[in-house]
């Protein structure tokens, strides 16, 4: 991936304003603690459906997106249309990309799963036809096709999970860029604040009205097993729903 990121402003018509909700729901109640503040950001309109079909486009530049951990690429198509896509690893400025049935198997090209050979890394995968890319969108992520049966494709995710997807769903060749994201170093508390994270306060340091562990005279242990602010046990209680017809094998924990 090219390290020459665009330093200027994004395309204005492909941006929208982002409103921070600071962890509140539609009733104004806190549903996600330790969120708030942060710098003002502009969202980018990402082409998850790759709706420009059978028309080649060139990578005009690679940009930073403040809303996600992966990089994005500005594509200029031969008909003059511009759009942003999630930049896969290995996509360079000046590369030509396509979205069509029969493509060259190189990063950035997009097609149906039925046309992608077994063993190839893919990203930005649809879960349902014409819904747009819904998973494998985070930095450094990818899935691998391990088998095909009639109109069903079996994908293996990085977590080890095996999942069924219809063969008419779209996917993009390659893995998502910026795999070094997991090695980032925030270095100081101010970086967390700029990202919209607030300090994490212990439950035993709160008042009884704020947390089940709160209150008491002096320092206390909380008096009960560790729970969330809503009283749900935090250590050892399964929270994931196990029923899904599309998951062949669960991820490796």
Swiss-Prot record:
A GO MF label: structural constituent of ribosome
GO biological process: mitochondrial translation
Keyword terms, alphabetized: Mitochondrion, Ribonucleoprotein, Ribosomal protein
Cited PROSITE patterns: RIBOSOMAL_L2
Cellular location(s): Mitochondrion
One GO CC term, this protein: mitochondrial large ribosomal subunit
Pfam families according to UniProt: Ribosomal_L2, Ribosomal_L2_C
Protein name stated in the entry: Large ribosomal subunit protein uL2m
Originating species: Acanthamoeba castellanii
Gene (name only): RPL2
């Amino acid at each position: 991936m090219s390290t020459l990121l665009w330093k200027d402003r994004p395309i204005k018509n492909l941006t929208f304003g982002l409103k921070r909700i600071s962890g509140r729901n539609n009733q104004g109640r806190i549903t996600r603690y330790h969120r708030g503040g942060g710098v003002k950001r502009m969202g980018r309109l990402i082409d998850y459906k790759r709706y420009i079909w059978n028309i080649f486009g060139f990578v005009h530049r690679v940009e930073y997106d403040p809303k996600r951990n992966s990089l994005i690429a500005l594509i200029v198509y031969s008909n003059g249309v511009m759009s942003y896509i999630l930049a896969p690893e290995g996509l360079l400025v000046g590369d030509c990309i396509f979205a069509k049935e029969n493509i060259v198997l190189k990063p950035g090209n997009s097609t149906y799963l039925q046309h992608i050979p077994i063993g190839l890394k893919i990203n930005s995968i649809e879960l349902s036809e014409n819904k747009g890319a819904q998973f494998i969108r985070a930095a450094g992520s990818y899935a691998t096709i391990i088998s095909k049966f009639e109109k069903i494709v079996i994908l293996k995710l990085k977590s080890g999970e095996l999942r069924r997807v219809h063969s008419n769903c779209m996917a993009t060749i390659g893995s998502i860029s910026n795999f070094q994201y997991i090695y980032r170093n925030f270095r100081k508390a101010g970086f967390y604040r700029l990202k919209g994270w607030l300090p994490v306060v212990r439950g035993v340091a709160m008042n009884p009205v704020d947390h089940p562990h709160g209150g008491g005279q002096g320092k206390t242990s909380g008096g009960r097993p560790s729970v969330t602010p809503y009283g749900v046990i935090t250590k050892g209680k399964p929270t994931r729903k196990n029923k899904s017809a599309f998951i062949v094998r669960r991820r490796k924990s």
